[in-house]
Curated annotation (Swiss-Prot):
The lineage of its organism: Bacteria, Pseudomonadati, Pseudomonadota, Alphaproteobacteria, Rickettsiales. It comes from Anaplasma marginale (strain Florida). It holds the Pfam family BATS. HAMAP family: BioB. Pathway: Cofactor biosynthesis; biotin biosynthesis; biotin from 7,8-diaminononanoate: step 2/2. Its cofactor is [4Fe-4S] cluster; [2Fe-2S] cluster. This is Biotin synthase. Homodimer.
Length: 324
């Protein structure tokens, strides 16, 4: 059952469940809403690297920190098309692209729409992560055929000031609402391991589950500490705590894809299998996610074979504009 009225205490009660009971409950919810043993596979490209004016304390691309990152200007349409073809070859059915900037500028909008069209021409779903977005920009992206827009809340409203101060929590939610109003599917999740408490994790999931519409994709990132950022020395989140968060996300947002995102490259096969048992049913493929390492395609193929998992197929690979 889809709910949009979760309380913090209800979410915390799920986190407090005995681990085996929680996993059993989450898996039961999962198989009621998705085909068991299917995982959606997405690829991610950085179309503009570095010099971001935001001060997100975890991010290698922030201009506020000296991380030694090589900066790169906006990609060309041909570069995006080539990357999309490669993503399809290694098994992706969704191609996501992200830019290190605060918000989408109108001067770049037409080129971004061309990126979407190039991706769709390869028979892939498209997803963009371009920072804050105005309603009219979202509508233009919808017209170009964009399927998904990613804009994470990162953490709880209460802990947020410890993560970033150049963008408010409400500004993040406003972008999510603009995307939903334009009719684009939302991809929205957060990052674990930034020093937040269990209550913060529960609060973040309550925020997501109480949106007017649940995000169709919920990426759960495991912090990859980057040298030169304020969070470079953060201890890694406990594996069981991470899996618990996956399970609670699955229960609270039963029809959403729960994605293992950043940090998966450092997870053992057993850890990934446990996450999938708890309800994770989407991954990023490719050896790099923006600026952090990811699992190799051959490792993913071996894992899928060991677990008897098959990639799911995209449901919207044709532009809505083409269908009109």
């Amino acid at each position: 059952m889809i709910r949009n009225n979760w309380t913090l205490e209800e979410a915390l009660e799920l986190f407090r469940m005995p681990f085996s009971d929680l996993i059993l409950k989450a898996h039961s919810v999962h198989v009621q809403n998705f085909r068991n043993n299917e995982v959606q596979v997405a690829a991610l490209m950085n179309i503009k690297t570095g010099s971001c004016p935001e001060n997100c304390r975890y991010c290698a691309q922030s201009a506020h920190y000296n991380t030694g990152l090589e900066k790169k200007s906006l990609s060309t349409v041909e570069e995006v098309k080539t990357a999309a073809k490669r993503a399809k070859e290694i098994g992706a059915d969704r191609f996501c692209f992200a830019a290190a900037w605060r918000n989408l500028h109108d001067r770049d909008l037409e080129k971004i729409c061309q990126f979407v069209e190039a991706i769709k021409s390869e028979g892939l779903e498209s997803c963009a992560s371009l920072g804050m977005l105005k309603l009219d920009q979202a509508q233009k992206l919808k017209e170009s055929g964009l399927d998904f827009y990613n804009h994470n809340v990162d953490t709880s409203r209460e802990f947020y000031h410890n993560v970033v101060t150049t963008r408010t929590y409400e500004e993040r939610l406003e972008t999510v609402r603009n995307v939903q109003q334009a009719g684009i599917k939302v991809c929205c999740g957060g990052i674990l391991g930034m020093g937040e408490s269990t209550e913060d994790r529960a609060s973040m999931l309550v925020t997501l589950a109480n949106l007017e519409q649940h995000p169709l994709s919920v990426p759960i990132n495991r912090l990859v500490p980057i040298e030169g950022t304020p969070m470079e020395g953060n201890p890694k989140i406990d594996n069981i705590d991470f899996v618990r968060t996956i399970a609670v996300a699955r229960i609270m947002m039963p029809a959403s894809y729960v994605r293992l995102a950043a940090g998966r490259g450092e997870m053992s096969e057993e850890m990934q299998a446990l996450c999938m048992l708890a309800g994770a049913n989407s991954i990023f493929c490719g050896e790099k996610l923006l600026t952090t390492p990811n699992a190799r395609p051959e490792d993913d193929q071996r894992l899928f074979s060991q677990l008897g998992i098959t990639p799911s197929r995209a449901a919207c690979t044709t532009s809505d504009a083409q269908l009109a």
